[in-house]
Amino acid sequence: AKKTPGPEYLEPKAISGDHGLMLEERGAYGVIASITPSTNPVATVINNSITMLSAGNTVVFGFHPNAKNCCIKMVSILNDAIISVGGPGNLINTIENPSMEASTELMRHEDVKLVCVTGGPGVVKVAFSCGKKVIAAGPGNPPVVIDETADLDKAAKDVVNGASFDNNIMCIAEKECIILNPVFDKVREKMKQHGAFELKGEEITKVMKVVFDSNGQLIRKWCGKDAKVILKEIGIHVSDEIKLIIAEVDRNHPFVEEEMLMPILPLVRASNIDEAIDIAIVAEHGYFHTAMMHSHSIENLHKMASRINTTIFVKNGPSFSGLGFNGEGHTTLTIAGPTGEGCTTPKSFTRERRCVLIDYFRIV
């Protein structure tokens, strides 16, 4: 909440000239329908509520059914907080029994002027079919590249911390790690020193059978589970210090191609920086969401930043630094790459309004 921007982002703009004064201000849309996923639900409610209300709107949430109870509780806490400082009640609302059908009805309601949606292709498609302004935060599969010029110990620690944060449930977290071959083994060993457990040989296959069904689909019940819980399922018992599972795989492995949303990080070898960036671009799937790179080469950092073309690009830090944690800038949990708003602020949830007065109000 402390890192989420408020009304201070809504600065008016005035221009005076020979023909008078022009004033531009940011105006509220009114009622916003905010459709949220089961991943990172409570923090998203807090973040979206602050930014949307700061812009002068009210919001009605359509939660994922799996996150119903915690989100409804948070809405109640936020409304009580608003009332306690003299604000009106029920600025934040929710569907009592959330479902895809109920969320669709909400988005299409005539009083809803703006739709903000975070989710898969299905719900995003429905949002665009409503004929309203849509702010869409799509999926991500963020790659991280480590080259031979990086501070290898720091890079390994940052990647482990970023990929294991909230058990990899966040869309910005490192989902695959591409390492240049000359430093691959060193980075892998340093990751193990910082809390990673390496799968080898048949162990990789065993974990795949746990987290994927027979049709190759991700089994959602494993999303967000602790690394030790997943390892226990294949008969490996580790201490609480283990927070991430790593495994060396090829670039086409399901661990690389899928947004796993669990603390499993595939490691992929690359022979040079251009190959590493090529692998990262393919793995990112053109979502233009988030990417990271650890390097002391300005040329390599520039090359990847320009080619990967993501909304967030973190240099020499963990993924969560891109949201202002141990990094600069504001925090957002609605990263609207598909519709171009990027890291949303209160300004994202406003309309630009202009007022012009002819021939008056200029004082010089």
Q: What name fits each language-model region?
A:
Residues 1-22, 193:
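N-terminal Rossmann-like NAD(P)+-binding subdomain of aldehyde/semialdehyde dehydrogenases
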Residues 109, 137-139, 170-173, 258-263, ...:
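Short glycine-enriched loop/turn motifs at secondary-structure junctions
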Residues 60-65, 178, 316-317:
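Short internal beta-strands
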Residues 46, 124-251:
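ALDH superfamily catalytic-core signature
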Residues 12-154:
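Rossmann-like NAD(P) dinucleotide-binding subdomain of oxidoreductase/dehydrogenase enzymes
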Residues 236-364:
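Conserved C-terminal structural/oligomerization subdomain of aldehyde/semialdehyde dehydrogenase
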Residues 107-110, 151, 212-220, 259, ...:
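Short, surface-exposed amphipathic charged segments that create phosphate/polyanion-binding patches used
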